[in-house]
Amino acid sequence: MLGAALRRCAVAATSRAGPRGLLHSAPNPGPAAAIQSVRCYSHGSSETDEEFDARWVTYFNKPDIDAWELRKGINTLVTYDLVPEPKIIDAALRACRRLNDFASTVRILEAVKDKAGPHKEIYPYVIQELRPTLNELGISTPEELGLDKV
C-alpha cells in the first residue's frame, strides 16, 4: 500500500503539462528503480552497558565542563529509555558541585525518580548507592527538601 502511494506521488511529481495543456505521465520505472525498504538505523555497532556507562562517566568527569554541557548531558541522558547507573549519577552530581549548580542536582534526582516509574524499589536503591556522595557533597534529596509533598 505504501509502495503504491509512493509510486503515485512520484508519477504525479514527474508529470508535466505539454504544449496544449495535456498531462504526460513519466515513463514507467523498471524493476531496478523499485522502492526498497532499508533499515538505516541498524547498521551501526551496538554499545555494551559498560561502554555506555564509561562514556557518560567520562563526559561528566571532564574538568572543563560548563553549565550548558552539563544540562545538555542531563537532557540527553534523560531521553534514554533507562535509569542511569549510580556511577553515572555520581559523576553528574560531582559535575554539578564543581559548577555550584544545586538546582541541577535536584533535577537529576527527580529525573531518576521519574525514570524509575512504577518500579518503587529502583529509586531507594539509587539513593542508597549515592548516599556517601550526597553526604560528601552536602546534597539533599528532593524528599529531604520536602519537594515530594508539593
Curated annotation (Swiss-Prot):
<keyword id="KW-0999">Mitochondrion inner membrane</keyword>
<keyword id="KW-0832">Ubl conjugation</keyword>
<comment type="pathway">
    <text>Energy metabolism; oxidative phosphorylation.</text>
</comment>
<dbReference type="GO" id="GO:0005743">
    <property type="term" value="C:mitochondrial inner membrane"/>
</dbReference>
<keyword id="KW-0809">Transit peptide</keyword>
<dbReference type="Pfam" id="PF02284">
    <property type="entry name" value="COX5A"/>
</dbReference>
<protein>
    <recommendedName>
        <fullName>Cytochrome c oxidase subunit 5A, mitochondrial</fullName>
    </recommendedName>
</protein>
<keyword id="KW-0496">Mitochondrion</keyword>
<keyword id="KW-0007">Acetylation</keyword>
<dbReference type="InterPro" id="IPR036545">
    <property type="entry name" value="Cyt_c_oxidase_su5A/6_sf"/>
</dbReference>
<dbReference type="GO" id="GO:0045277">
    <property type="term" value="C:respiratory chain complex IV"/>
</dbReference>
<comment type="similarity">
    <text>Belongs to the cytochrome c oxidase subunit 5A family.</text>
</comment>
<feature type="modified residue" description="N6-acetyllysine">
    <location>
        <position position="113"/>
    </location>
</feature>
<dbReference type="GO" id="GO:0006123">
    <property type="term" value="P:mitochondrial electron transport, cytochrome c to oxygen"/>
</dbReference>
<feature type="transit peptide" description="Mitochondrion">
    <location>
        <begin position="1"/>
        <end position="41"/>
    </location>
</feature>
<dbReference type="InterPro" id="IPR003204">
    <property type="entry name" value="Cyt_c_oxidase_su5A/6"/>
</dbReference>
<keyword id="KW-0349">Heme</keyword>
<comment type="function">
    <text>Component of the cytochrome c oxidase, the last enzyme in the mitochondrial electron transport chain which drives oxidative phosphorylation. The respiratory chain contains 3 multisubunit complexes succinate dehydrogenase (complex II, CII), ubiquinol-cytochrome c oxidoreductase (cytochrome b-c1 complex, complex III, CIII) and cytochrome c oxidase (complex IV, CIV), that cooperate to transfer electrons derived from NADH and succinate to molecular oxygen, creating an electrochemical gradient over the inner membrane that drives transmembrane transport and the ATP synthase.</text>
</comment>
<keyword id="KW-0408">Iron</keyword>
<keyword id="KW-0597">Phosphoprotein</keyword>
<comment type="subunit">
    <text>Component of the cytochrome c oxidase (complex IV, CIV), a multisubunit enzyme composed of 14 subunits. The complex is composed of a catalytic core of 3 subunits MT-CO1, MT-CO2 and MT-CO3, encoded in the mitochondrial DNA, and 11 supernumerary subunits COX4I, COX5A, COX5B, COX6A, COX6B, COX6C, COX7A, COX7B, COX7C, COX8 and NDUFA4, which are encoded in the nuclear genome.</text>
</comment>
<feature type="short sequence motif" description="SIFI-degron">
    <location>
        <begin position="2"/>
        <end position="17"/>
    </location>
</feature>
<keyword id="KW-0479">Metal-binding</keyword>
<feature type="modified residue" description="Phosphothreonine">
    <location>
        <position position="141"/>
    </location>
</feature>
<dbReference type="GO" id="GO:0046872">
    <property type="term" value="F:metal ion binding"/>
</dbReference>
<feature type="modified residue" description="N6-acetyllysine">
    <location>
        <position position="87"/>
    </location>
</feature>
<keyword id="KW-0472">Membrane</keyword>
